[in-house]
Amino acid sequence: MDIVAENRKVRFNYTILSEYDAGIVLLGSEVKSLRQHKVSMGDAYVLESGMELWVHNLHISEYNRSSYKNHSPLRVRKLLLRRREINKIAGSVKASGITVVPRLVYFNERGLAKVRIALVKGKKLYDKREAIKAREWEREKGRTMKRDI
């Protein structure tokens, strides 16, 4: 698995409830840009429309060697999932406070571009502070153990 981009803020800002691997419909120049790791997914999110899932704000830069028919960097892209997975995700999103965000863009073993999407629920500010405290404590503990050994 060749990881192209990861949205690291997802783990900090949200509690991950479940994850799904989805295919994505891309143009040729978008695939070439992905292979060059020219993608940004900081503000990306997934919406359901007409029993299909669409990813918004996934910025794939224009391929510099492409012809005049280059793609739009922020175009809306369709995600490919099984019908029962789409129904499950759409049912979960109807519940309050649950969002779907792309967490990872990668190429699988067969060379196909995939997006790992996550069903998430937003963390409260005190949860984020708690996570920071726990992370700092682990670092300090590791430093102390390293120094004492």
UniProtKB/Swiss-Prot annotation:
Subcellular location(s) of the protein: Cytoplasm
Q: Extract the GO molecular function terms from the UniProt entry.
A: RNA binding
Primary location recorded for the protein, binned into one broad class: cytoplasm
Q: Which SUPFAM superfamilies match?
A: Small protein B (SmpB)
Gene3D superfamilies linked to this entry: 2.40.280.10
Q: Which GO terms describe its biological process?
A: trans-translation
**Which is a Gene Ontology cellular component entry for this protein?**
cytosol
Family annotation (InterPro entries)? SmpB, SsrA-bd_prot, SsrA-bd_prot_CS
Which of UniProt's keywords are assigned here?
Answer: Cytoplasm, RNA-binding
Q: Which family does it belong to?
A: Belongs to the SmpB family.
Which function does this protein serve?
Required for rescue of stalled ribosomes mediated by trans-translation. Binds to transfer-messenger RNA (tmRNA), required for stable association of tmRNA with ribosomes. tmRNA and SmpB together mimic tRNA shape, replacing the anticodon stem-loop with SmpB. tmRNA is encoded by the ssrA gene; the 2 termini fold to resemble tRNA(Ala) and it encodes a 'tag peptide', a short internal open reading frame. During trans-translation Ala-aminoacylated tmRNA acts like a tRNA, entering the A-site of stalled ribosomes, displacing the stalled mRNA.
HAMAP family on file: SmpB
- Protein name per UniProt: SsrA-binding protein
Organism, by scientific name, is Anaplasma phagocytophilum (strain HZ)
Q: List the taxonomic lineage.
A: Bacteria, Pseudomonadati, Pseudomonadota, Alphaproteobacteria, Rickettsiales
